[in-house]
Curated annotation (Swiss-Prot):
Similarity-based family: Belongs to the methyltransferase superfamily. L-isoaspartyl/D-aspartyl protein methyltransferase family.
Listed name of the protein: Protein-L-isoaspartate O-methyltransferase
E.C. no: 2.1.1.77
A molecular function (GO) term: protein-L-isoaspartate (D-aspartate) O-methyltransferase activity
EC main group: transferase
Organism, scientific name: Pseudoalteromonas translucida (strain TAC 125)
Gene: pcm
Length: 212
């Protein structure tokens, strides 16, 4: 299967389309990105299943449907260019974003994961991504504002620093809650922030600080 990952990735894209993902750019990105390089060798046989998988350090690579749906929501909201990702993790979501948006900034608190993700993105010739090892709660102030912000770990509430770094008219997507999490879209209009609950989800927690 892995020797012919293109067929497997296309099959995954077709599955996500049947599950309700409609954006053709997102589906094309899923079909083009080899998900198996973002997981360990022992789990590569599961790489093209629609399921989350462990990647070490207590973290996971998100379910492909969630990756596709969150990316699609940014597209539908009109985000086109500058996107901040909080929680690089394996780099799979980063790669999908890089296929669609002009410039992607990604922050990862665990340095080992950040370096692994950077190597994978270079392997795929994705050079429109800037990566940083740091505390995701703080965002990336020096590169703000961002038209879109996507948070790939759950917080009890959205960190204020991230809201402040959202451009006027920009869109933030994040899983909110502790025991019961809900994917939430926040749209900024001047100093007003409007929240829309999208769906129940399950993510690892967004932890403050960073790890060397």
């Amino acid at each position: 299967m892995l020797a012919n990952y293109t067929r497997s990735a296309k099959a995954l894209s077709a599955l996500l389309q049947r599950e309700g993902v409609e954006d053709t750019q997102v589906l094309d990105a899923i079909a083009q990105i080899p998900r198996h390089i973002f997981v360990g060798d022992v789990l590569q046989h599961k790489a093209y299943q629609n399921t989350a998988l462990p990647i070490g350090q207590g973290q996971t690579i998100s379910q492909p449907y969630i990756v596709a749906r969150m990316t699609e929501l940014l597209q539908l909201a009109g985000v086109r260019d500058k996107v901040l990702e909080i929680g690089t993790g394996s780099g799979y979501q980063t790669a999908i974003l890089a296929k669609i948006f002009t410039k992607v900034y990604s922050v990862e608190r665990i340095k080992a994961l950040q370096w692994q993700a950077k190597r994978r993105l270079h392997q795929l010739d994705l050079y429109n991504v800037a990566m940083k090892h740091g505390d995701g709660w703080q965002g990336w102030e020096s590169q703000a504002p961002f038209n879109g912000i996507i948070v790939t770990a759950a917080a009890a509430k959205i960190p204020q620093d991230l809201l402040a770094q959202l451009a006027d008219g920009g869109v933030l997507l994040a899983p909110i809650g502790e025991q019961e999490q809900k994917l939430t879209m926040v749209i900024r209009n001047g100093n007003n922030y409007t929240e829309h609950v999208i769906a129940p989800v399950r993510f690892v927690p967004l932890v403050a600080g960073d790890i060397e």
